[in-house]
């Protein structure tokens, strides 16, 4: 362990929570900023709002996800269990930093979709072992509400699946609304944290939409909560980074999650700077050998 990390652990490693913060914060940032961010995260997670053990943000950590989604997804399925351990994720880019790589390593199978040919080529190279054993498919496709169901059918996936993850920086709301071919038990979807509750807003649908890097994208958390209710889902939490919301099918959620299932209760503001943090060395997916 480097002197820098030893100092960090000494300063913030007094409890399990703070040790988690130290691990989460180690990586790309200089020592002073690591310490500042570690203290900030620790302070936020130890506030009364986050004291309830049902609050998912307490369980976040990063392995291959952009921020703390890996830990939250793990905790959701610890509570509700799994069925066919099948996922679909779109907007994966090159697959190195997304919400389902850890699931692949945990033995899941699924489908990735991305609209860029070079990303799909890199996925086929970097994840060749998962293609070889038949657990991963990847399709190059520009995703919109008109195409999404046929893409699932092309991949031979329909009916119940355990997880759907949506991050396309634009039409996320409209694409989720259009999905009929699959019925995921859990949905992870990006929300626009600039549009705080109670605002219920979504950008108008444009099948050719591409994100321009501004705050004009996607849907507010309240808009997604309302759509979720229409589709039979309840909001169970948001990532600490304020990037993703987590929904669970009503009949699956039971009493496992914090009430009320409202945007006001679960909203997290944008802390996108946490995407600069790593879980250690630069990410490199397996294959690993299970022993």
Segments the model singles out, each with a brief description of its role:
Residues 134-137, 174-210:
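A short alpha/beta connector and helix-capping loop motif
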Residues 165-175:
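Active-site glycine- and acidic-residue-rich loops that bind
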């Amino acid at each position: 362990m480097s002197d820098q990390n030893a100092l960090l652990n000494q300063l913030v490693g007094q409890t399990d929570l703070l040790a988690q913060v130290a691990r989460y914060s180690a990586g790309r940032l200089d020592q002073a900023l690591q310490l500042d961010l570690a203290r900030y995260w620790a302070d936020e997670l130890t506030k009364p709002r986050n004291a309830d053990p049902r609050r998912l943000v307490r369980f976040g950590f990063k392995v291959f996800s952009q921020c703390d989604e890996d830990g939250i997804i793990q905790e959701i399925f610890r509570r509700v269990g799994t069925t066919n351990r099948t996922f679909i994720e779109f907007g994966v880019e090159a697959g190195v930093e997304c919400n389902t790589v850890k699931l692949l390593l945990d033995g899941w199978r699924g489908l990735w979709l991305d609209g860029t040919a070079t990303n799909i080529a890199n996925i086929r190279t970097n994840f060749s072992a998962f293609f070889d054993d038949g657990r991963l498919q990847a399709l190059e496709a520009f995703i919109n509400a008109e195409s999404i169901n046929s893409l699932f059918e092309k991949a031979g996936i329909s009916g119940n699946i355990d997880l759907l993850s949506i991050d396309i920086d634009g039409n996320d709301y409209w694409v989720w609304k259009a999905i009929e071919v699959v019925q995921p038990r859990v949905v992870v979807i990006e929300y626009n944290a600039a549009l705080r509750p109670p605002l219920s807003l979504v950008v108008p649908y444009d099948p050719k939409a591409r994100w321009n890097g501004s705050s004009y994208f996607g849907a507010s958390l309240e808009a997604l909560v309302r759509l979720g209710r229409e589709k039979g889902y309840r909001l169970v939490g948001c990532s600490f980074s304020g990037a993703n919301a987590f929904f669970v099918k009503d009949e699956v959620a039971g009493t496992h999650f914090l009430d009320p299932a409202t945007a006001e209760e679960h909203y997290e503001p944008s802390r996108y700077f946490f995407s600069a943090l790593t879980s250690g060395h630069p990410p490199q997916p397996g294959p690993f050998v299970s022993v």
